Curated annotation (Swiss-Prot):
InterPro entries associated with the record: CarboxyPept-like_regulatory (IPR008969), M14_CPE_CPD (IPR034232), Peptidase_M14 (IPR000834), Peptidase_M14_domain (IPR050753)
Protein name: Carboxypeptidase E
Keyword Zinc-finger annotated: no
MF term (GO), any: metallocarboxypeptidase activity
Gene3D superfamilies: Carboxypeptidase-like, regulatory domain, Zn peptidases
Catalyzed chemical reaction(s): Release of C-terminal arginine or lysine residues from polypeptides
Record's keyword terms, sorted: Carboxypeptidase, Cytoplasmic vesicle, Glycoprotein, Hydrolase, Membrane, Metal-binding, Metalloprotease, Protease, Secreted, Signal, Zinc
Record localization: Cytoplasmic vesicle, Secretory vesicle membrane; Secreted
Pfam family, one: CarboxypepD_reg
Species per Swiss-Prot/TrEMBL record: Lophius americanus
Length: 454
């Protein structure tokens, strides 16, 4: 990851933004082309420099930076015990509403933080938030360059190479479905990730950059913002049998449905049971309460949503936010008002389930320890500081921590709706246990020798 110095990023333009940031902090409800997007993010950073940071995870095929605005009380650092959250928008370049909403969200969080909104202050102090307004800046520029207000349904969807980025990720669904039948790992399905990604010539540069990002930061929760319908979509996206439409539950189907509803319930259009389909012949039969299982709607191989879940600890859903992919500019404020509360509430879901640390008996963190939940065939692993976050719905669970060379520890946990329950584990190494057993045996032998006068 490369942090962007604003002076290098925008040159002389920064000077004018410095003076404007204090007097005119509102971002107007309009579309932001690439240069305008950069300026908008820098404006947020200038207004809230203590809680904001701009960085890039790489470049698009045409050389545009894949920009991220981070918001945290300690930007630039993973704080042990603090969960990481991300929003990604504009993966399809012609699906533009999500791109603008993340710009508005950044400004909103900054404004509310400065105005003393306790909910937002607590959220930023307890969460490291990453906002990527555009994963496909090349596609957006192509879509936005079309004349007139009505944009073509497909122009700009793919990246500059013609690659559909939401069909371009390694297809881990096929691996997990094989493992379900024949036995095998249920998480982190790509070994030697960096090499496998770098050597895969079929992956677009935008896809590679996001994969490395997912592998570098221990994200817990994410959402991928799209357009073309109005629904919150959850894994699995790809069907088990190859059927076009088939409910494809993941092991975490219960919490995924709850996460999707956490977004849809605050969006009055998405949650409206009387909402007509976006188009006359659309099949919305799988939509209920504004949510749908991905496979039940239509099967998507190589999607980013399932890749997050199967390659890392990150749970991701896909948010379809508008019937029109590139609606008229005068509707953007309405879309913001419809989605503002949903966007904030969904971030708060990162503080559900159980969290804590896995350490050895000397207090040293155990990296890559496995956290398992009885009855859920999907494990997560600890980060470098031994910290972990396991999203769960309210209920009673048996949670286990294990690691090679250590004895497994199992704990019973009562999990409320929120906040997350703190559950720490101390694991005893097998070497220590063997040493204890050897010492106990020697003590017993000594006692027996003295008793029998050997």
């Amino acid at each position: 990851m490369k942090q962007i110095c604003s002076i290098v990023l925008l040159g002389a333009a920064v000077v004018s933004l410095v003076s404007a940031a204090g007097s005119d902090s509102e971002i107007s409800f309009e579309y932001h082309r690439y240069e305008e997007l950069r300026k908008a993010l820098v404006s947020v950073w200038l207004q809230c420099p203590t809680i904001a940071r701009i960085y890039t995870i790489g470049e698009s095929f045409e050389g545009r930076e894949l920009l991220v605005l981070e918001m945290s009380d300690n930007p630039g650092t993973h704080e042990p015990g603090e969960p990481e959250f991300k929003y990604i928008a504009n993966m399809h370049g012609n699906e533009a509403v999500g791109r603008e909403l993340l710009i508005y969200l950044a400004q909103y969080l900054c404004n509310q933080y400065q105005q003393g909104n306790e909910t937002i202050i607590d959220l930023i102090h307890s969460t490291r938030i990453h906002l990527m307004p555009s994963m496909n800046p090349d596609g957006f520029e192509k879509a936005a360059s079309q004349p007139g207000e009505i944009k073509d349904w497909f122009v700009g969807r793919s990246n500059a190479q013609g690659v559909d980025l939401n069909r371009n990720f390694p297809d881990l669904d096929r691996i997990i479905y094989t493992n379900e039948r024949e036995g095998g790992a249920n998480n982190h399905l790509l070994q030697n990730m960096k090499k496998a990604v770098d050597e895969n010539t079929k992956l677009a540069p935008e896809t590679k950059a996001v994969i490395h990002w997912i592998m570098e930061i221990p994200f817990v929760l994410s959402a991928n913002l799209h357009g073309g319908d109005v629904v919150a979509n959850y894994p699995y996206d790809e069907t088990r049998t190859g059927s076009t439409h088939e409910y494809s539950a993941s092991p975490d189907d219960v919490i995924f449905k709850s996460l999707a509803k956490a977004f849809s319930i605050y969006n009055p259009v998405m949650s409206d049971p009387q909402r007509p389909p976006c188009r006359k012949h659309d099949d919305d039969s799988s939509f209920k309460d504004g949510i749908t299982n991905g496979g039940a709607w239509y099967s998507v191989p190589g999607g980013m949503q399932d890749f997050n879940y199967l390659s890392s600890n990150c749970f991701e859903i896909t948010l379809e936010l508008s019937c029109d992919k590139f609606p008229n500019e005068d509707t953007l404020k309405t879309y913001w008002e419809q989605n503002r509360n949903s966007l904030v509430n969904y971030i708060e879901q990162v503080h559900r389930g159980v969290k804590g640390y896995v350490r050895d008996l000397q207090g040293n963190p155990i990296f890559n320890a496995t956290i398992s939940v009885e009855g859920i065939d999907h494990d997560i692993t600890t980060a470098k500081d031994g910290d972990y976050w396991r999203l769960l719905r309210q209920g009673n669970y048996k949670v286990a921590a294990s690691a090679p060379g250590y004895l497994t520890v199992i704990k019973k946990v009562a999990v409320p709706h929120s906040p997350a329950t703190r559950v720490d584990f101390e694991l005893e190494s097998l070497m220590e246990r063997k040493e204890e057993e050897r010492e106990e045996l020697m003590d017993w032998w000594k006692m027996m020798s003295e008793t029998l006068n050997f």
